Amino acid sequence: MNREQIADALRQNQVVAYPTEAVFGLGCNPQSESAVKKLLDLKQRPVEKGLILVAPSLDFFRPFVDFEQINDEQLSRLQGKYERPTTWIVPAKSTTPHFLTGKFDSIAVRLCDHPSVKALCEITGFALTSTSANLTGEPPCRIADEVRSQFGADFPVLDEMVGRAHNPSEIRDLRTNQLFRQG
């Protein structure tokens, strides 16, 4: 499928697969509880774990992130360019849905400059949820055909290439810089 078709599917609260910096991600509209539920069911992922949001700029995260709790140094770190994709655990607004934050008062966000992510966010006007496109026990998908093999020929997949990163994103706490997952 092309970008417009995937954007339409996202607007219709479907779960889609799209390329990121290293692997294909599964994503949906983060403001749609029904879409997020479909995503969690598909991944067999407990809601308590929370989800990552990706977007090309901080503006897409404004509905979810409590920027008043982030100081200038932390903001610089959040906006920084790194050798590997980096996801940051940041303070969530009290209004951010629990189906996104899980059992936490924070949310995971990643600024992503992959052209596919940038285009989908700009076309739809919202950030995307991001979890690796793979079934439990299977390796993350790196090409569109692997996504179709795991999720079915009719699954909405953006037929574009992943970036050059070798590993999924590193995950760090923005306030403490604690490493949760090595990238």
UniProtKB/Swiss-Prot annotation:
One GO MF term on file is: ATP binding
Which ranges form a coiled coil?
none
Give every YrdC-like domain span. 1-183
Coarse class of the protein's main subcellular location: cytoplasm
Keyword Signal carried by entry:
no
Where does this polypeptide localize? Cytoplasm
Please name the SUPFAM superfamilies in this protein's record.
YrdC/RibB
Query: Does the keyword field hold Cytoplasm?
Result: yes
This enzyme catalyses:
L-threonine + hydrogencarbonate + ATP = L-threonylcarbamoyladenylate + diphosphate + H2O
Listed A to Z, the keywords are: ATP-binding, Cytoplasm, Nucleotide-binding, Nucleotidyltransferase, Transferase, tRNA processing
The UniProt entry's GO biological process terms, in alphabetical order, are:
regulation of translational fidelity; tRNA threonylcarbamoyladenosine modification
Class of enzymatic activity (EC top level): transferase
- Cite the EC number: 2.7.7.87
Gene Ontology CC, one term? cytoplasm
Role description: Required for the formation of a threonylcarbamoyl group on adenosine at position 37 (t(6)A37) in tRNAs that read codons beginning with adenine. Catalyzes the conversion of L-threonine, HCO(3)(-)/CO(2) and ATP to give threonylcarbamoyl-AMP (TC-AMP) as the acyladenylate intermediate, with the release of diphosphate.
Q: Which family does it belong to?
A: Belongs to the SUA5 family. TsaC subfamily.
> Per its record, how is this protein called by name?
Threonylcarbamoyl-AMP synthase
**What organism is the protein native to?**
Haemophilus influenzae (strain PittGG)
User: What gene makes this protein?
Assistant: tsaC
